[in-house]
Amino acid sequence: SRTLEVKDGQMDKFMSGVAKKTQMYNNSEDSANFVTFQILTGPNATDFIRVRWMESIDELDNPVDAEELSYWNKVARPYYTEGAARIWSRNANLSHVPEGSDGNLRRVIYYNYKDSGEQDFFRFRQRVKKAMVESGYGSAMNVLGCASGCNGNWVQVRFSHDGYEGQSADYGEPLQAMIEKYNELYGNDAYEQDSDKVDATL
């Protein structure tokens, strides 16, 4: 992933260029799978994050198609400055993606845990995944660890929602049902206690 900071006054040109490139190249199975998200909140609000999705890191050995890259450099590259590049690895054992779950809104939480807190941090994530599965939580949650380009033990947890209305709905009854299942599986008030342990690891 890479953060893109759009230059002042260039937002319309940038977004138009990204849309054209996406329409022209992202529908091909042979092209690299790029996704561009606008950041809506936080310190990087109004910037963008550009992600190249790969099934395996081996795909980095294959360069992006020269024609596709040239087109991106023509229609989008003049309008932004680049931030640091990072490689993230999805942890399937900690992620929960129910069949048919999707959404155009992502809530992404970044964590940087201390070395001493690794066990508490990942035990909580394992338990959340199990509670989601057993409670029938209907939205996706993906957990990614930083494999390269980060200073520290960085993890991002990505929640998918069907817009803000979907986010509000997901954090209502489905979230409460997941927490109840968590406490049923691991003991009274286990969710709150384990959450506090995670907070202490950060």
Place the predicted regions along the sequence by residue.
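Short S/T/G/P-rich N-terminal loop/turn motif that feeds into the first structured element of a domain
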Residues: S1-L202
